[in-house]
Structures are given as C-alpha cells and as structure tokens.
Amino acid sequence: MVKIKAAVCHEFGTPLKIETIDLREPITGEVEVTLGAVAVCHSDISFADGDWGGELPAVYGHEAAGFISKIGDSVKGFEIGDRVVVTLIKSCGYCNNCSEGNPTICEDNSNAEPPILSMKGNTIQQVMNCGAFAEKVVVDQSQIVKLNNDLNFATASLLACGVITGIGAVVNAAKLRPGQDVVVIGAGGVGLNAIQGARIAGARRIVAVDTNGDKLTIAKEFGATDGVLATEKSPWRIAKSLVGRGADIVFVTVGNSSVYDIAPRYLGYGGKVVMVGMPKTGDKSVYEPVMMAAVSQGMIGSKMGDVIIKRDIPWIVDLYEQGRLKLDELVSKTWTLDQINEAIADTKLGSAKRNVIVFEAKQAS
C-alpha cells in the first residue's frame, strides 16, 4: 500500500474532502500511474451530486494523464516511466462487443480487488474505473494509451474524455460524410470537439447552438460556421434558415432531457440525432415516433465517441501536432487538488471549456 492524497465524496451534493487514503499495488494486468493532471468533467459533477446514484464514499475523476510508476504482472507494451493518457474505457478484449471493435461498451463488468481504501481499511469506490481526483491511480492496462511526445499533462488529460467523446461521436458513431450539414447543441468541452470533428470530417455547415453568446463566439473559433442562441424563439427554424434545410446530423452534447425533446426539430429528412450528453437517471424525453418514422429519421447513442483508444488517440494527437486540431485552447484554467471544489463550482457556471487539476508529479530521469 502507498499513501496518496485524494478528493473523497462522503455525501452527495456536498464539497469533496481532501484526505490521505491507501492505494494498493497493481496486480496482474494493471499499472500504477502517477498523475500529472486530471480534468473536471460534468460527468464527475453529476456523480458527485447524486444524479446517477452510486455507492459512497467515492473518488471521482476519469480524464487524466501522467506517467507509469509501477507495473503489475502480464502487462505488455508499457514500461515504467511511460507517459500515458488514462481513460475510463476498461475492456476485456473477449466479449461480443470487444470482439466486434466496440470496447466502450464492453460486457465484462467484473472488477478486481478495489484499489483504494480509507486509512481505516474500508473500501472507497473507484468510480468509472479511475478515481483520478487523486495523486495516483491503479488501472487496467486496457485503459491507457502511451504518449510518444512531450504534450503537457494538462492538455493530454483532455484526450481521455472530452476530446475523444466529441470527435468520436462525429467520426465513429455518426460516420459523417463530407458535405453533410450538422447542428451541435451545446458548445462546452464535448461540443467544441464535436465541432472540430465535423470540420475535420468535411461537414458543409456546422451550426452551434447554446444559451451563451460568448460560447457561440468560441465555437466559431473551433470551426462552427454559424451560431444560434438556444434562447431564441424556435431556434431550430433559425438553424434551418442558415443551412437552407434541416440538418443531416444533430449532436446533443448537454445532459438535459428537455434538449432531447426538441433536438429532432433541427433534422432534415433522413437525418439522425446522436445522443452524447447524459441527463439525470430517471429523466424522460418525449417524441412523436410517427413523425420521425415517416421521414426516415433516427436516434443513436454514442458512449465515449465509440472510440478504440489505441487507434484514435494517436491519430488525434497527430492532427494536433499538424496544427489541424485545437487542444491547448480547451484548457480554461488550471487548479491544484486542494482547489478542486472551487474548480467544480467554476465548471458549474457553464462558461469554462475545461478546468484542469494539475499535480506536481516528478518523473525519475
């Protein structure tokens, strides 16, 4: 066991507490990663607020980067000192979905011995297989991707969730074709990356929709051709007038069920809604199936951009190195672990692209 600092949730909807906890050694197939940075994602906030349930106490955080500091047995392709991105995508490699190239929806829910414990020896939940609001994590080797460049950890951490979720939703889930028109509802961290993905994939028009005018301005910097305030009366009509028709694809990147109610109104004939943002457990949306079926419209879900991390993350990094993709600009502000509750409060205001917690991780030379 090694002692580490972590931000622990003991009660939903209350500030996280910085505590010293125990982290066990990595076992077969696992690695210990000393973290350099972890981003604050709205999913972490939803869990901490109790929107999706779960057991407590718990450590959240799933969008991280650092270097490997210990390696368990049977780990292949990684060495101590390797700089890596740490994701929540734990895959067995053998179930039907993994065998078909869909590791984000791996069917194997079995878990190893819990890696984190309180100082009294009680189990602490490692949420989303990461628990990265901490100085170190122990994760499965399937969750990490090696970084072969000197990308700083704050920027690299975003590759673990927001970037791959947005870009992957466009390229992998929607399979956008050059010349298609898209609407992206929500111009936050994931939405901006959906916009970047649409630009890279060759979309003709990219319409960003958000309640915040400043975020629409930022969306255009990331590749949106147009912006529509969601507070306007019938914003879907404005979007259609800008495009000249309904959209081929609408990406919903916010976790609000009322947004899902109106998302199909942006569609053209044969279009589809891609569900990316996740509302609270139990929230419902209402549709008119006859209207969608009559014009061959549809809806699909996209978890973590349907990515294969060892394929997609290196590709995305290469685009960044070529200057074709913005990553550094996604970091709104950096914070320390002791400031995590302030970072969460700032994220809840809705103006940040991504707040990132940085650690003083010192890698042996």
Residue ranges, per PLM feature:
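C-terminal hydrophobic helical "lid"/dimerization subdomain
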Residues: 1-4, 237, 249, 261-265, ...
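Residues located in well-ordered beta-strands
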Residues: 5, 17, 22, 34, ...
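Residues in the short beta-alpha loop(s) of Rossmann-like NAD(P)-binding domains
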Residues: 12, 212, 279, 305
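NAD(P)H dinucleotide-binding glycine-rich loop of Rossmann-like/cofactor-binding domains
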Residues: 23, 92-185
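Glycine-rich beta-strand-centered segment in the early N-terminal region that forms part
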Residues: 24-38, 48-99, 104, 128, ...
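Mid-domain Rossmann-like dinucleotide-binding core that forms the NAD(H)/NADP(H) cofactor-binding site
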Residues: 83, 142-144, 148-233, 237-238
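Glycine-rich cofactor phosphate-binding loops and adjacent beta1-alpha1 units
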Residues: 174-178, 190, 201, 213-298, ...
